[in-house]
């Protein structure tokens, strides 16, 4: 079982990475990097009282971060999540176009490279951040289900390899990769359907 100093050092290292990335500024990616760095710490046996302490500390600093550290466009991303129709041609444009693309795909989609939202450049970063919207529009629900099945198979294989590993290091490393991969999938999907603010992943 790791010592308390090991958890502290790892947390500091993850926070330094978060700070450097967030200064770009890229707060979303910085948070993802921090969480990804903390996943192995949790899997190594981080006590629940420490996790609770992290959460309490996060709740305490959130008002200060919102008022003093977040840039205006970052605050607007959060506010847009609550009411994307308030500025449909400005801050709400990305999520509105994304939801339109997803909803218009239907069961089978409009066909490969035949999506109007994606091919006419209504969707920003359609090749990366909003690729889920493009797949939903062009391949429909069937394409999305096929994608989830493929993702599920990859994640299942990762955790199966972790289960078969002989050392704790191998198990923690493999399981961490599986959880980080799952984290990126969830963030991307939840972002494009409007459940969490838009971040680049």
Spell out what each predicted region is:
Residues 1-94, 133-194:
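Hydrophobic alpha-helical transmembrane segments of multi-pass inner membrane proteins, especially
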Residues 29, 128, 199:
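Ser/Thr-centric signal marking residues that sit
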Residues 52, 112-116, 147, 201:
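Short loop/turn and capping residues at structural boundaries
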Residues 92-113:
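Extracytosolic (periplasmic/ER-lumenal) interhelical loops and adjacent juxtamembrane/interface segments
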Residues 106-142, 169:
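Long extracytoplasmic/lumenal interhelical loops at the membrane interface
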Residues 194-201:
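Transmembrane alpha-helices of multi-pass inner-membrane enzymes
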């Amino acid at each position: 079982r790791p010592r308390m100093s090991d958890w502290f050092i790892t947390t500091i290292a993850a926070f330094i990475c978060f700070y450097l990335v967030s200064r770009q500024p890229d707060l979303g990616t910085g948070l993802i990097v921090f969480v990804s760095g903390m996943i192995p710490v949790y899997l190594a046996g981080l006590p629940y009282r420490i996790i609770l302490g992290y959460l309490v500390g996060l709740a305490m600093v959130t008002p200060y971060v919102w008022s003093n550290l977040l840039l205006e466009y970052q605050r607007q991303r959060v506010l847009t999540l609550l009411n994307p129709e308030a500025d449909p041609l400005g801050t709400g444009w990305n999520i509105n176009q994304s939801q339109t693309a997803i909803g218009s795909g239907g069961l089978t989609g409009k066909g490969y490279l035949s999506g109007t939202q994606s091919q006419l450049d209504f969707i920003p970063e359609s090749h990366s951040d909003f690729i889920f919207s493009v797949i939903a529009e062009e391949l429909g629900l069937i394409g999305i289900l096929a994608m989830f099945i493929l993702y599920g198979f990859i994640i299942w294989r990762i955790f199966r390899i972790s289960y078969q590993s002989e050392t704790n290091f191998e198990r923690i490393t493999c399981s961490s990769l599986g959880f980080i991969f799952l984290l990126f999938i969830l963030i991307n999907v939840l972002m494009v359907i409007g459940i969490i603010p838009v971040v680049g992943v």
